[in-house]
Amino acid sequence: MNQVARGAGAKRYADAKAALAGVVADGQTLAVGGFGLCGIPEALITALRDSAVSGLTVISNNAGVDGFGLGQLLATRQIRKMISSYVGENKEFERQYLAGELELEFNPQGTLAERLRAGGAGIPAFYTATGYGTIVADGKETREFDGKHYVLETALQADVALIKAWRADTAGNLVFRKTARNFNPACAMAGRICIAEVEEIVELGAIDPDQVHLPGIYVDRLVLNATPEKRIEQRTVRQGDK
């Protein structure tokens, strides 16, 4: 895999296509940030859709929706396997999975988050009570501690992490915007190479160190997307008085 320059001025790329070039390849495992459609790297996903890369394993909280987010990569059949938690908003995902065309490794949401965190921290595996006695535990080691039963879950790591942040400085220090932080930091730390899509890039020193959510040591490439669509996944409005 090509090495990525880590100098403060070398992390910014002209566009999402350039940011993906040389690091994303067929058959890789990608960790993609977001929670539903909140905090997803829209431009990077679209650029990935427009590339010829295929056979991907994607670790993500969700599978996007039809025609947006990771749903675009499912429509183009670029994803071979999903390691995910909530996938109920995507009809194409459902169709491919039920037809045996798509592999799925299903995880409780907290377990998925901890598997990513463990991967970033260099912890190979951990025990959790979540899923014991269910199909989640099938084929996995179980143990009893102090009278309680636990399932052994292994860490997750990715070849490349694609994440979304609100603001970055030129060294890659990131600030996330409220709930859009979600799975993004965990994905970044679990990726051997991390590409961050951000809405604003400022000079080094412009961000108060106490406000940095993810240090630049975890970020290899930056791409600016100042006006993401930020599509709403489920819109609920109050019924008018009758």
From Swiss-Prot:
Highest taxon above the source species: Bacteria
Annotated positions binding CoA: G33, G34, F35, G36, L37, C38, G39
Subunit-level organization: Heterodimer of a subunit A and a subunit B.
Organism: Xanthomonas campestris pv. campestris (strain B100)
Gene name per UniProt: lpsI
Record EC number: 2.8.3.5
NCBIfam families (UniProt xref): pcaI_scoA_fam (TIGR02429)
Reactions catalysed according to its record: a 3-oxo acid + succinyl-CoA = a 3-oxoacyl-CoA + succinate
Top-level enzyme category: transferase
Any single Pfam family the record assigns to this protein: CoA_trans
Family: Belongs to the 3-oxoacid CoA-transferase subunit A family.
Stated name of the protein: Succinyl-CoA:3-ketoacid coenzyme A transferase subunit A
